[in-house]
Amino acid sequence: MVRARRTKRDSVTNIYRTCKQAGNCPPDVVNKVEQTTIADQILKFGSTGVFFGGLGIGTGRGTGGSTGYVPIGEGPAIRVGGTPSVVRPGILPEAIGPADIIPIDTVNPIDPNASSVVPLTDTGPDLLPGTIETIAEVNPAPDIPRVDTSVVTTSRGSSAVLEVASEPTPPTRTRISRTQYHNPSFQILTESTPSLGESALTDHVVVTSGSGGQPIGGVTPVEIELQELPSRYTFEIEEPTPPRRSSTPLRNITQAVGNLRRSLYNRRLTQQVNVQDPLFLQQPSRLVRFAFDNPVFEEEVTQIFERDVAAVEEPPDRDFLDIAKLSRPLYSETPQGYVRVSRLGNRASIRTRSGATVGAQVHFYTDLSTIDAEESIELSLLGEHSGDATIVQGPVESSFVDLNVQELPQVIEVDPEPTFHSDDLLLDEQNEDFSGSQLVYGSGRRSTTFTVPRFSTPRSDTFYVQDLEGYAVSYPERRNYPEIIYPQPDLPTVIIHTADTSGDFYLHPSLRRRKRKRTYL
């Protein structure tokens, strides 16, 4: 059997062009040309939410569209014989609105009777408005003095040397003036430290400058040899040194402290007890058992308490029950920075037949409170002062007038050496005035003292004895009592009723009907 030859179908575009008019186009051709396939519908409805950006995804040929694929970095290809597309530039829209107002120079009105002939003038044309006329100014060059120079020539093959003499520098005149005023009332303490520009005594002046000076007058200072200290580099920064734990930080000591810390703070093998009693610091044995004080014995060593286990003894502190051994005090530092005093103790709770004791280890500790640093206050020296201290001299700062010479000349004439001096004005004379005093009567130290004031009253003179502290006030009194009028019960009670047209009334309590008990048969 001979197999039929399969012929190739025409292109979809040609088939659609011929069969569209007849109306017998295959459905695949219509969907492909009109882009109604499932893929086209997915892209059509999915493009509303997803943008693929010109990737060329579609049902057409993979030729990159009508223009083809363009490599990256190159322009579009140009076909020979084709009509190039012209790209027109965008036209900027013009703004709609009134035009700018341009000022126009005013023109003089023309006289109708004037002549129409324009006379000629010899002047040049006027400059247009808006232009700037520039006039060049020529300044003559300044006179430069000539300098005569000498040219030195040699027969050797070296280059020529031109010597130019420099201009002489005019001398500079310096004038230094000094003015001194003598003030006899101004004095300086001999203990004051002279600084730059400060004078000492009236006959001793120190003139110094920034780099040194030479004292004039007074005692010649003694020069001593000074040692120059090396200066600190500018980039060197001084940092605080951390506090040292010990003077000789050896590794063996560190290991011993670590082992002791593990033995003290082992939660599983050592019981932790915080002691608040202050006897734990000085006499811890009084917390274990009752004993007498021995001032000679120092409890800074390990203590062993021997007693019978069968004998039940209650210690002064319940935390130290069955303590058989108490170590010496150990000092450490807590994470909070407090000083902790610790003692490691062993309990003898159980004793075997062989004599061995069994008990737990207990770590007794107490934390010492902090000592707050007191604020430092500035103290002044008594009886002495340094050279930089400030002392106010009364005779120098204050103004005193000698009354012996100026204000009391008659005293000087009578007595050449008067006994009165200006310092006598400083004495405070107390003048006693008894105008507002009171008379006090009393006898003996233990007797009661009464103050008897006298008051002026319209009555006869009367003395009031004041036995209480305070002020006594006297004022006139009246003995006229007001007359009391009592009502008479014989008069009948008058009841006045007013005319009321509103329909309401007020019934007097006396007009109300009394309730009576009735007997029912």
Curated annotation (Swiss-Prot):
One GO CC term, this protein: host cell
Keywords: Capsid protein, Cytoplasmic inwards viral transport, Disulfide bond, DNA-binding, Host endosome, Host Golgi apparatus, Host nucleus, Host-virus interaction, Late protein, Microtubular inwards viral transport, Phosphoprotein, Viral penetration into host nucleus, Virion, Virus entry into host cell
InterPro entries associated with the record: Late_L2
GO molecular function annotation: DNA binding; structural molecule activity
Pfam family, one: Late_protein_L2
PTM per Swiss-Prot/TrEMBL: Highly phosphorylated.
Chain span(s) of sequence motif Nuclear localization signal: 1-10, 513-520
GO terms under biological process: microtubule-dependent intracellular transport of viral material towards nucleus; symbiont entry into host cell; viral penetration into host nucleus
Subcellular location: Virion; Host nucleus; Host early endosome; Host Golgi apparatus
Cysteine disulfide partners in this protein: C19-C25
Highest taxon above the source species: Viruses
Family: Belongs to the papillomaviridae L2 protein family.
Record's function text: Minor protein of the capsid that localizes along the inner surface of the virion, within the central cavities beneath the L1 pentamers. Plays a role in capsid stabilization through interaction with the major capsid protein L1. Once the virion enters the host cell, L2 escorts the genomic DNA into the nucleus by promoting escape from the endosomal compartments and traffic through the host Golgi network.
Quaternary structure annotation from Swiss-Prot or TrEMBL: Interacts with major capsid protein L1. Interacts with E2; this interaction inhibits E2 transcriptional activity but not the DNA replication function E2. Interacts with host GADD45GIP1. Interacts with host HSPA8; this interaction is required for L2 nuclear translocation. Interacts with host importins KPNB2 and KPNB3. Forms a complex with importin alpha2-beta1 heterodimers via interaction with the importin alpha2 adapter. Interacts with host DYNLT1; this interaction is essential for virus intracellular transport during entry.
Name of the protein in question: Minor capsid protein L2
Organism encoding this protein: Human papillomavirus type 49
Gene for this chain: L2
